[in-house]
Design a protein with these regions (language model features):
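Extended carbohydrate-recognition surfaces in non-catalytic/accessory domains of CAZymes
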Residues: 21-82, 135, 141, 147-150, ...
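An acidic-aromatic loop/edge-strand motif
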Residues: 22-52, 116-185, 192, 259-267, ...
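Accessory beta-strand-rich segments of carbohydrate-active enzymes
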Residues: 30-31, 59-167, 196-197, 341-344, ...
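Short strand-edge motifs at loop-to-beta-strand transitions and within beta-strands
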Residues: 64-66, 107-111, 220-226, 672-676, ...
């Protein structure tokens, strides 16, 4: 009668046992006819190594084990084992016997383990999980980290032998179809799958309505239909839900099993104008995408943090969530239902395919799992099946083979699109393209779905903001009868960087604000876009990325630990008419050049136009040329990264030995001197250095989409540095410290009018004696090249009391 949940409690991980709560009969919780045991903590083995300074992260096979005593009283019950998600392959063993295998890391799966269990004894369960590359399982590659582990709940379920299905795609076996809905009435058809013959009683209730239906089970399925007059419709503003309680009785009328589901009543369509209509009202779909990872946790998030995400997206003013690039679990979808977010959901078919039957079969299985596990959710209004599938095609050097590959890929997309329509004819399908529309259109991808999603980053990866307008116009002329969504747009930004002179790839909040201030109004006003989803709600793990926040894609409106950025407040100000958010987005404190006071530490971000606030809340100012009575550099030019799209203002490398990467990713190269006119006294001078160039061509992030550094012919760098009258140092950063490593060099100097710097190799500084305040004395750092050009990344001058 009762459903029992026995949890895995011991994790065996790379030879190390990690224990959760010990098994205790007293910890069983009963709810109605059910009882369940608290689950072990969700886990990934990549929570930390995906962001460390070592390239790559662990991708391999690991084992979770548990021993579970199954009471003899369970001998007449059925047992199934359910896993919410394990990335990306899983092999289940019970008492040493192989039970089953599952491919795919983002959907739930379940196995009937009854034949393998020993009642009245301790049973040994082993779940082997691998996140190793497998050419037959999507995603093959992607701009996100493939965390390994059992990161959603796993449990052993005991039911009576007669029960609602636990093996049908790991659902509760009850499905609600609501294709006929209007203001005046709604028709709902309910199907319940069972393990055997019996009678099903269904109680549908909500919003003042209640009705009991009865149906007999035939061939493992019971079906009933009802009409609800004047239904309380579901929408983002009024997310009204109904419930259906399902009871299964045996032939003697004895209650055997009970489950419940929620559902919503709404109707929607994309109209003749290609806009989205919900319950007869035109709605512009606007919101974001979300990745399911969190700083220091990977993808093993507790429900509390997942709930916070969805509430923050709603509070931003969003009505739409693109659940990308994979299904994200029952709890997330329940939240979208209950607070009112329209959703698209997609399988992780990203970047490329493998031209094998096994790969295609796994794609189809993922579609089946996605649809069956999410079809009851009223929030889901779009099924999607691929993202940027031609972004990383093989055979680029062989035009004939490339063309054949593209045709094979298009065939797979057409097959998946047809399968989605067969699985669920009530929801439209979507394919998402990167900014290479001509190639997709040429091979027929644009005809392989009901909706076309466009990922456009004009003004970030290349071009200018106006490229968005031109691309949308081009696509709508080619597809006049196809609804279009702007499914991705965004600019990487680090909240620590602010500037009055924003430029592409400076990672400043201010450039990101410029970007979104063009894109969001365009989406809202465009008569050709049904909506848009900013990429992304949160900064997310992408191990191969090497920007201002290495190993993260930092296009999020909030940080990886969910601190809102100014871009979040900008969206809130527009979508919620919140003037407070608008003021927050407009705030930028200007720091003006002025004579340096003895008590004011001077911190300069060389080669940069940005203010940088470090983790200790110390502000580093942008560089300036030397001015009499103040401070600044003499000679040189800002370091720039040369790409096929032009020169960018910062190196795209992971700076080792620091989290303040932006300080070291910019620099002034060819610098001759740095001078500050200071009151007499003792100062600590810290030169921050890092070598940003190498003689060999580095393998940079493939996701910078053409913004990878080009070879500069760099042959090395060696320089002599002298601080005031201290002995000079000869520095070769690569030989002495290694490339891309933060090197702080600290000096202590005393300055007084009688202690002017002197060096036969000193550069010729501007004569400022006439304008220098009489109570200041120059502090100088002099640079002389031995080979290559001198470099200075950042500098501190700190008065010593």
């Amino acid at each position: 009668m009762d459903k029992k949940v026995l949890s895995f409690l011991v994790l065996w991980f790379t030879g190390l046992a990690v224990y959760a709560n010990p098994v205790s009969v007293s910890r069983w919780h009963t709810l109605g006819t059910r009882a369940q045991y608290p689950l072990f903590e969700r886990h990934t083995w990549n929570a930390l190594d995906a962001t460390d300074e070592q390239p790559g992260y662990l991708r391999g096979r690991y084992t979770y084990t548990d021993s579970v005593f199954i009471p003899l009283s369970f001998a007449d019950k059925s047992l199934s084992l359910s896993v919410g998600a394990a990335n990306q392959e899983a092999w289940l063993y019970v008492n040493g016997d192989s039970v089953g295998y599952h491919a795919g890391g983002y959907t739930a799966f379940a196995f009937d383990v009854t034949p393998y269990c020993r009642f009245g004894q301790t049973n040994y369960i082993r779940l082997v999980v691998s996140n190793a590359y497998n050419e037959n399982i999507p995603p093959l590659s992607a701009d996100f980290t493939f965390f390994g582990g059992v990161y959603r709940d796993a449990f052993l379920l005991a039911t009576p032998s007669l029960h609602f299905s636990t093996s049908h795609y790991a659902t509760r076996g009850v499905y609600v179809y609501t294709s006929q809905v209007s203001d005046s009435q709604a028709t709902a058809r309910i199907e319940a799958l069972t393990s055997g013959q019996g009678r099903v009683e269904l109680v549908v209730s909500g919003h003042g309505f209640s009705k009991t239906l009865k149906a007999s089970v035939r061939r493992g399925k019971a079906t009933a239909q009802l009409t609800i007059p004047h239904p309380a419709l579901w929408s983002p503003d009024t997310p009204n839900l109904y419930s259906v309680s399902c009871r299964l009785y045996d032939k003697h009328g004895v209650l055997q099993d009970e489950v419940s589901e929620s559902f919503g009543l709404r109707w929607y369509a994309f109209g003749e104008d290609n806009m989205f209509y919900l319950n007869g009202q035109k709605i512009k779909l606007i919101g974001s995408s979300r990745h399911q990872c969190y700083k220091h946790l990977g993808n093993a998030l507790p429900d509390s943090l997942q709930r916070k995400d969805i509430l923050m997206i709603k509070a931003m003013g969003a009505n739409f969530l693109r659940v990308a690039h994979y299904p994200q679990g029952e709890y997330i979808m329940h939240l979208c239902d209950s607070i009112g977010l329209l959703c698209s959901v997609e399988i992780p078919l990203v970047n490329a395919i493998t031209e094998t039957d096994s790969f295609a079969t796994n794609c189809r299985n993922m579609l089946d799992e996605m649809v069956w596990q999410n079809r009851n959710h009223p929030s889901v209004v779009i099924w999607a099946y691929s993202n940027e599938i031609l972004l990383r095609p093989p055979f680029k050097g062989d035009s004939l083979r490339h063309s054949l590959y593209c045709r094979h890929t298009a065939d797979l997309c057409r097959d998946l699109n047809a399968r989605l329509h067969t699985l669920d004819s009530s929801r439209p399908t979507m394919i998402v393209l990167h900014d290479n529309f001509k190639e997709y259109h040429r091979y027929g991808f644009t005809q392989a779905a009901d909706i076309v999603g466009l990922n456009i980053y004009s003004g970030w990866y290349s071009g200018t903001f106006s490229g968005l307008d031109k691309t949308v116009e081009k696509v709508r002329l080619a597809l006049p009868n196809t609804p279009l969504l702007l499914t991705e747009f965004g600019a990487d930004c680090d909240p620590r960087l602010r500037t009055a002179y924003p430029q592409r790839f400076d990672y400043s909040m201010d450039y990101a604000l410029l970007f979104h201030r063009h894109y969001l109004p365009f989406v809202l006003s465009s008569p050709y876009l049904a909506g848009g989803a900013v990429w992304n709600f949160n900064d997310f793990h992408s191990e191969a990325r090497l920007g201002a926040l290495p190993h993260y894609n930092c296009k999020g409106l909030v940080s990886a630990d969910r601190c809102p950025k100014l871009t979040y407040f900008y969206y809130q100000s527009v979508l919620c008419s919140d003037s407070v958010g608008q003021h927050a987005a407009d705030t930028l404190r200007q720091m003006l050049s002025m004579p340096v006071a003895p008590a004011m530490p001077l911190r300069i971000n060389l080669g940069s136009r940005c203010f940088f606030t470090d983790d200790s809340l110390r502000v580093w100012q942008p560089e300036q040329p030397y001015q009499s009575g103040s401070w600044g550099y003499v000679g040189g030019e800002p370091f720039t990264k040369k790409t096929k799209y032009g020169q960018l203002p910062a190196a795209d490398v992971d700076i080792l030995g620091t989290d303040a990467d932006p300080l070291y990713q910019t620099a002034r190269v060819g610098i001759e001197a740095f001078r500050a006119d200071l009151p007499a006294g003792q100062y600590r001078v810290i030169l921050h250095l890092a070598e940003l160039e190498t003689a060999e061509q580095e393998q940079m992030s493939v996701y910078n989409l053409g913004n990878e550094a080009l070879s500069t012919g760099f042959l090395g760098r060696e320089m002599v540095v002298r601080v005031q009258n201290l002995p000079p140092d000869t520095i070769n950063l690569t030989q002495q410290f290694g490339k891309y490593r933060a090197v702080p060099l600290c000096y202590v100097v005393d300055i007084s009018p009688a202690d002017s710097p002197s060096d036969s190799s000193a550069v010729s500084l501007p004569d400022s004696s006439a304008n220098t305040p009489s109570d200041t004395t120059p502090l100088q750092v002099l640079f002389r090249p031995l080979s290559g050009t001198p470099i200075l990344n950042a500098l501190e001058i700190i008065p010593i009391d």
